[in-house]
């Protein structure tokens, strides 16, 4: 039986070295693959995160835009009624308009709301917009605390010539009498829906001495003219003003404007 030749020591060392090199190469290749997969995973995770952020931002932006258009009822109606008509303080319409109408109202009075939303837009369109009548708003706050809260913000909005916008939106979003609906959050939301109104400035001014004085003046005028309910209107030319209720307002304006 032939004898199998045994590898020499050198040959065994060379073989062991080759195995070691091959093993190290395999380990290095496996490590490289793991690193590539890890980097790829990180890239994919980062990409997914970016996509998620973009989707969230897009959804948030879309939601914000939608909320700004739809969260406050009456925004479009208010714009349609008042857009383009000059305002100065309490007054809506041209200062040169020959006929003057002073409205006494409480912003949580449901009768004031109903008349303002149902009949006032046509009166404004027919008489105020053409420059025949100028209207002045006087806030009365006799129903309760919500009346006071809303009246103060409305009066503060008048300092920025935005009273009529705020008043109209307040009527569109009016809650039940003395239900506590006129919270700061609600009033801020309404004020924020008025184009061009600096909400922070209005809220800073609502408790000012100037606002208090104007509300007191409105009450004094109402008492002097015998106003017993809201809405009540004074209609006429110059200082000759006649008190009428909502039902009598259209005829009184028509008579004051003349043919």
Spans of model-derived segments:
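Short extracytoplasmic/periplasmic juxtamembrane "stem" segments immediately C-terminal to an N-terminal membrane anchor
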Residues: 67-89
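A short beta-strand-turn-helix
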Residues: 82-99, 127
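Conserved short-loop catalytic and cofactor-binding motifs
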Residues: 89, 141, 154, 175, ...
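Structural alpha/beta surface segment adjacent to cysteine/selenocysteine redox centers
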Residues: 97, 102-192
């Amino acid at each position: 039986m032939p004898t199998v030749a045994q590898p020499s020591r050198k040959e065994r060392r060379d073989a062991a070295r080759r195995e070691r090199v091959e093993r190290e190469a395999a380990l290095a290749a496996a490590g490289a693959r793991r690193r590539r997969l890890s980097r790829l995973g990180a890239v994919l995770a980062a990409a997914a995160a970016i996509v998620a952020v973009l989707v969230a931002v897009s959804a948030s932006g879309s939601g914000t835009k939608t909320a700004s258009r739809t969260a406050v009822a009456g925004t479009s109606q208010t714009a349609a009624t008042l857009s383009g008509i000059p305002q100065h303080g309490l007054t809506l319409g041209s200062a040169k308009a020959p006929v003057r109408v002073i409205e006494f109202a409480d912003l949580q009075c449901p009768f004031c709301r109903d008349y303002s939303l149902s009949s006032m837009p046509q009166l404004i369109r027919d008489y105020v917009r053409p420059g025949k009548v100028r209207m002045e708003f006087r806030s009365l706050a006799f129903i309760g605390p919500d009346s006071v809260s809303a009246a103060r913000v409305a009066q503060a909005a008048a300092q920025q010539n935005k009273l009529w916008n705020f008043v109209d939106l307040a009527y569109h979003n009016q809650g039940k009498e003395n239900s506590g609906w006129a919270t700061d959050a609600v009033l801020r939301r309404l004020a924020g829906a008025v184009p061009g109104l600096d909400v922070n400035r209005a809220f800073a001014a609502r408790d000012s001495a100037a606002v208090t004085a104007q509300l007191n003046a409105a009450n004094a005028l109402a008492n002097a003219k015998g106003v017993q309910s809201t809405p009540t209107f004074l209609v006429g030319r110059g200082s000759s003003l006649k008190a009428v209720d909502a039902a009598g307002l259209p005829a009184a304006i028509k008579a004051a404007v003349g043919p």
